[in-house]
Amino acid sequence: MNGKTIILANPRGFCAGVDRAISIVERALEEFGAPIYVRHEVVHNKFVVDNLREKGAVFIEDLAEVPPGATLIYSAHGVSKAVQQEAAERGFRVFDATCPLVTKVHKEVARLDAQDCEIIMIGHKGHVEVEGTMGQLAPGKMLLVETVGDVAKLEVRNPDKLAYVSQTTLSVDETKDIIAALNARFPNIRNPHKEDICYATTNRQTAVKELAEQCDIVIVVGSPNSSNSNRLREVAAGIGTDAYMVDNASYLQRAWFEGKNKVGVTAGASAPEVLVQEVLATIRRWGHETVREGEGAEESIVFVLPKELRREGETKPDLCKR
């Protein structure tokens, strides 16, 4: 034993929303056969998407690419009202793989709009979840802020009829700063009934923060277009620890580990455990012999499939409590 240790973050990897979204595509392929069309990558992970593509899933961005009467699945990130309307007009058989926690934000937007509140969204411009959430209302009806600096530039109709919602995969710490700035500038702004950042994002960021405090280097398994995976790397780096994000083990560089005794490994919510194990095997070959699991929050949430795709024993409620 050389004292070189790998610590695995807990929790890590797939969350309930990702599990559900992947299962919807797989079950639809089993029930209806290929091809099954999916608007956008069902989750942001190359390995997962490539695997589903091999099984017969076709990933598209424009509904014009989908033939009449075909089966269409919305990605876990959600879609706008305009996309839903177009899908209905084209007569597709639709299954909605939107994460229920994203759907919760969509419902909050509808409720606030019905109360004539102007809504601010905290999120990253261009991210598919942000496009879907802001697309719950007509273009221009919601305001987007990405940074604390954006808050000072906001022009609102009525500061007393104002509310905010958040993208579910943001940095917990950075979002707190933006929320503080919003509350400072608009004292009467309405906060969500419950934090929009999802339990899995929060738990994984807490775990990687603890990991970074113990380790000399942190490896995050996740694809470059995965928001929550990028945030994990940023959180670890923010502690002052060397942090790298890799899509799979082939992206690892041996030089990163020179002089590093403790290596932390985690994975974004859309990264499968098989990729973590491949990363682990590579690092072990390079001399880190001891592996141990870190401690963290236990997760037992399960989101069930749409009723049309459920099998015997797969019943409501949608949310099984932790």
Curated annotation (Swiss-Prot):
Q: In which pathway does it act?
A: Isoprenoid biosynthesis; dimethylallyl diphosphate biosynthesis; dimethylallyl diphosphate from (2E)-4-hydroxy-3-methylbutenyl diphosphate: step 1/1; Isoprenoid biosynthesis; isopentenyl diphosphate biosynthesis via DXP pathway; isopentenyl diphosphate from 1-deoxy-D-xylulose 5-phosphate: step 6/6
**EC code(s) of this entry:** 1.17.7.4
Q: Which domain of life is it from?
A: Bacteria
What Gene3D superfamilies has UniProt attached to this entry? Answer: 3.40.50.11270, 4-hydroxy-3-methylbut-2-enyl diphosphate reductase, catalytic domain
- Indicate which residues the UniProt annotation says bind [4Fe-4S] cluster: C15, C99, C198
Task: Respond yes or no to whether keyword Zinc is given for this record.
Answer: no
Answer whether the UniProt record assigns the keyword Iron-sulfur to this protein.
yes
Question: Where are its TM segments located?
Answer: none
Keyword annotations from UniProtKB, A to Z: 4Fe-4S, Iron, Iron-sulfur, Isoprene biosynthesis, Metal-binding, Oxidoreductase
- One Pfam annotation reads LYTB
What are the recorded Gene Ontology BP terms?
Answer: dimethylallyl diphosphate biosynthetic process; isopentenyl diphosphate biosynthetic process, methylerythritol 4-phosphate pathway; terpenoid biosynthetic process
Which prosthetic group or cofactor does it need? [4Fe-4S] cluster
Q: How is the cofactor bound?
A: Binds 1 [4Fe-4S] cluster per subunit.
What does the entry list as the binding residues for isopentenyl diphosphate? Answer: H44, H77, H127, S226, S227, N228, S270
Residue positions of the active site:
E129 (proton donor)
Q: Which parts of the sequence bind dimethylallyl diphosphate? A: H44, H77, H127, S226, S227, N228, S270
Instruction: Name the catalysed reactions.
Output: isopentenyl diphosphate + 2 oxidized [2Fe-2S]-[ferredoxin] + H2O = (2E)-4-hydroxy-3-methylbut-2-enyl diphosphate + 2 reduced [2Fe-2S]-[ferredoxin] + 2 H(+); dimethylallyl diphosphate + 2 oxidized [2Fe-2S]-[ferredoxin] + H2O = (2E)-4-hydroxy-3-methylbut-2-enyl diphosphate + 2 reduced [2Fe-2S]-[ferredoxin] + 2 H(+)
- Residue positions annotated to bind (2E)-4-hydroxy-3-methylbut-2-enyl diphosphate are H44, H77, H127, T168, S226, S227, N228, S270
One GO MF term on file is: 4-hydroxy-3-methylbut-2-enyl diphosphate reductase activity
- Family (UniProt): Belongs to the IspH family.
Q: What biological function has been recorded for the protein in this entry?
A: Catalyzes the conversion of 1-hydroxy-2-methyl-2-(E)-butenyl 4-diphosphate (HMBPP) into a mixture of isopentenyl diphosphate (IPP) and dimethylallyl diphosphate (DMAPP). Acts in the terminal step of the DOXP/MEP pathway for isoprenoid precursor biosynthesis.
Name of the protein in question: 4-hydroxy-3-methylbut-2-enyl diphosphate reductase
